[in-house]
Amino acid sequence: MINQLIANIKKTGAPIVVGLDPMLKYIPEHIQKKAFAEFGETLEGAAEAIWQFNKEIVDKTYDLIPAVKPQIAMYEQFGIPGLVAFKKTVDYCKSKGLVVIGDIKRGDIGSTSSAYAVGHIGKVQVGSKTYAPFDEDFVTVNPYLGSDGVNPFIDVCKEEKKGLFILVKTSNPSSGEFQDQMIDGRPLYELVGEKVDTVGRRLHG
């Protein structure tokens, strides 16, 4: 999948990603009014406004950018309708040839991590049928619970030819409380970065 992202970057000449992190209060009033007229001031109405706003952004930019990054929490706050809007956004972006990076920052272990991986970049079996629930191309993963939180995602990536962005050093103001802690003279995030690099080299190509 990284090859597709690189190809898109070369094609557009734009090593950037457009974040789709919608906040209802910033969505243009005419979009909100139309959505609320159809669905009322409900979760469904909010989700429809988000979806229409995203669609307009994508329609205006899809031939200029290589990828988009929807932040799932902005959709989850509107419950099931919000997740429907997230899925519609993912599908629409992919139909326009964009690489979709699901900004989900999952970090758990064992079967829970496996379920996250399957739900977002893998396939799930339901009886005799198979489904790709959210079907992003990449997802973001938090590695600070250890390798048993990341390995299930790696396994699914191998199977489905998907990709990961693994957090190493984050930009939030309090990140240094843990990430900058010194271990044998080196900050923790450097050790995490080395581990991620090792995994990446093993999966390269």
Segments from the language model and where they lie:
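N-terminal glycine-rich anion-binding loop in soluble enzyme alpha/beta folds
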Residues: 1-60
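Generic structural signal for well-ordered alpha-helices
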Residues: 2, 54-58, 86-90, 150, ...
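Hydrophobic beta-strand scaffold residues
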Residues: 16, 100-102, 164
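Conserved, mostly hydrophobic/aromatic
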Residues: 18, 68, 103, 139
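Glycine-rich, proline-tolerant flexible connector loops at the mouths of alpha/beta enzymes
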Residues: 46, 70-82
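Acidic (Asp/Glu)-rich catalytic clusters
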Residues: 58-65, 92-95, 154-160
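Catalytic PLP-binding core of fold-type I/II PLP enzymes
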Residues: 87-108
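Conserved anion-binding
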Residues: 108-205
